[in-house]
């Protein structure tokens, strides 16, 4: 089998049809998977010695949340080091990063694997991975044909990175130095709420406005502040963190503004406060709603005039600090109740951001679960940590009152429990490993299987045929919706339907 001009043209056309980078990436790997008839494909971005999935096809959703560090994945490291097509033999001793992550094939190891490093000039920018369950699945394709595929993928990724850089620099003031744009990979999530939040971060990061970040406990407000700072012209200078809720009233002023020797008992030397430490950088004030009214007045003065006074000193010090504040309270209600100054609220909330709770983020919970699974795998030296279908279903139907922080702790606890019940370095997280209270799951709809004299293969095919028919009827013969309902990949479903005689 070889690639025709029509095949390559079709891939190029699909790239042009995409609306936005993400859509183009998805069209690329979906088309490649169909052309190559492989079981899974993925487009990865290379950054800081790790591969970050941008688009996947035929893999579990949580793969999009995983971050594949080279030191923990020897196959990906081999791809990164290679300057050309990498074919891994079926008996390769190097573990495949996608073992257990192909839906419906969790218990099987990936047999065929091809890695295509993607370059922009001499710089590695990503990789395309192709995986199959048959050992000789890619033998029919020559290296030259695979290089053509790599060139198309590299061009698409390189153009996307260039456009991202140019768009971010257009947001800067005319005399500002170029800076790195917000990377979509820094904040995990593809839900509408997170997509909008990322756009707002890109917009406000280029300015010097104060930002008020609101959200429930555990939603990741500190991560938002970090993303704003790292994508701003101040990124070369420090980001200083201060938790206002952990400040005793007696030392709060000193922590913020510093003190001079002898200012109070125990002040044995001069000490800089957080504002001085953040000069020319960013100060992140977490739980800003916990500050006393007296400290709020002093903070307001700094925001108005840009100078501070150390405790015990009459002299003023000029500082250039951008303030990012976060709260889990409704500060408007706090203002009405007289617990927060209205003038300070308006100074801080020049550009308000709201971080959505995890229960409103849809499939983001699975992406985040994949991220935490990969963290646990690296931290505990395991070969793989994967979620069972039951565990994924449970996570998607739990409300997570503690948000992302609760999910992180739940994954870590589940990994420990799973390791205690089975030997080896492979962990499969089941629903029973999670101690969530009163989670109501939708009842499974079991298809009635008639009792007839059939051999095992015929009975299995009859069951598959009837299950697909029922799913198609429930989804108005929409194959993509049917595949989602059956928790399988649409390309695999089409192939199975053809084999079962359900479609031509």
UniProtKB/Swiss-Prot annotation:
SMART domains: AAA, GAF. NCBIfam families: PRK05022.1 (NF003451). One of its GO terms (molecular function) is ATP hydrolysis activity. Residues 479-498 bind DNA. Gene3D superfamilies: 1.10.8.60, 3.30.450.40, Homeodomain-like (1.10.10.60), P-loop containing nucleotide triphosphate hydrolases (3.40.50.300). GO terms for biological process: phosphorelay signal transduction system. InterPro entries: AAA+_ATPase (IPR003593), GAF (IPR003018), GAF-like_dom_sf (IPR029016), Homeodomain-like_sf (IPR009057), NorR (IPR023944), P-loop_NTPase (IPR027417), Sigma_54_int (IPR002078), Sigma_54_int_dom_ATP-bd_1 (IPR025662). Pathway: Nitrogen metabolism; nitric oxide reduction. This is Anaerobic nitric oxide reductase transcription regulator NorR. Keywords: ATP-binding, DNA-binding, Nucleotide-binding, Phosphoprotein, Transcription, Transcription regulation. It comes from the Bacteria. PROSITE patterns: SIGMA54_INTERACT_1, SIGMA54_INTERACT_2, SIGMA54_INTERACT_3, SIGMA54_INTERACT_4. The modification 4-aspartylphosphate is found at residue 57. Residues 187-416 form the Sigma-54 factor interaction domain. Pfam families: GAF, Sigma54_activat. The gene is norR. Required for the expression of anaerobic nitric oxide (NO) reductase, acts as a transcriptional activator for at least the norVW operon. Activation also requires sigma-54. The lineage of its organism: Bacteria, Pseudomonadati, Pseudomonadota, Gammaproteobacteria, Enterobacterales.
